[in-house]
Structure formats: structure tokens, C-alpha cells
Swiss-Prot record:
Record remark on domains: The cysteine framework is XX (C-CC-C-CC-C-C-C-C). Displays a mini-granulin fold, a structure composed of two short, stacked beta-hairpins connected by two parallel disulfide bonds. This newly described fold is derived from the same cysteine connectivity as knottins (ICK fold). The name 'mini-granulin fold' comes from the structural homology with the N-terminal region of the human granulin.
Family to which the UniProt record says this protein belongs: Belongs to the conotoxin D superfamily.
Function: Alpha-conotoxins act on postsynaptic membranes, they bind to the nicotinic acetylcholine receptors (nAChR) and thus inhibit them. Through its two C-terminal domains, this homodimeric protein would bind to two nAChR allosteric sites, located outside the nAChR C-loop of the principal binding face and at the adjacent binding interface in a clockwise direction. This toxin specifically blocks mammalian neuronal nAChR of the alpha-7/CHRNA7, alpha-3-beta-2/CHRNA3-CHRNB2 and alpha-4-beta-2/CHRNA4-CHRNB2 subtypes.
Predominant location: secreted
Keywords: Acetylcholine receptor inhibiting toxin, Disulfide bond, Hydroxylation, Ion channel impairing toxin, Neurotoxin, Postsynaptic neurotoxin, Secreted, Toxin
Highest classification ranks of the organism: Eukaryota, Metazoa, Spiralia, Lophotrochozoa, Mollusca
Annotated disulfide bonds: C18-C27, C23-C35, C28-C45, C33-C47
Annotated protein name in UniProt: Alpha-conotoxin VxXXC
UniProt-annotated location(s): Secreted
A cellular component term, taken from the record's GO annotations: host cell postsynaptic membrane
Organism expressing this protein natively: Conus vexillum (Flag cone)
Assembly and interaction partners: Homodimer. Pseudo-homodimer (identical sequence, different post-translational modifications).
Tissue-specific expression: Expressed by the venom duct.
Amino acid sequence: DLRQCTRNAPGSTWGRCCLNPMCGNFCCPRSGCTCAYNWRRGIYCSC
């Protein structure tokens, strides 16, 4: 359901939605990804 999806953060195309996990300011490429953190800040998706 698109209403449930997370808005992509600034820097992405406005109006796009993220159906996958968000990591920091970006959208992970697949639903099974987890976010790797550095000092509590999301730095990259681990897929």
C-alpha cells in the first residue's frame, strides 16, 4: 500500500516512495536489506 510507504529523504526525487527499509537518508534497494550504522547514523544498506 503506497500510503504506508516511507517518503524518500531530500536528495531523492520528490514524490517517490520507499517500500524498502530506509537507511540514513536513502532507500535500500531490496526489502530484505538491513541498515548498517556508524555512531547511530545509517551509513549503508547490507543486502
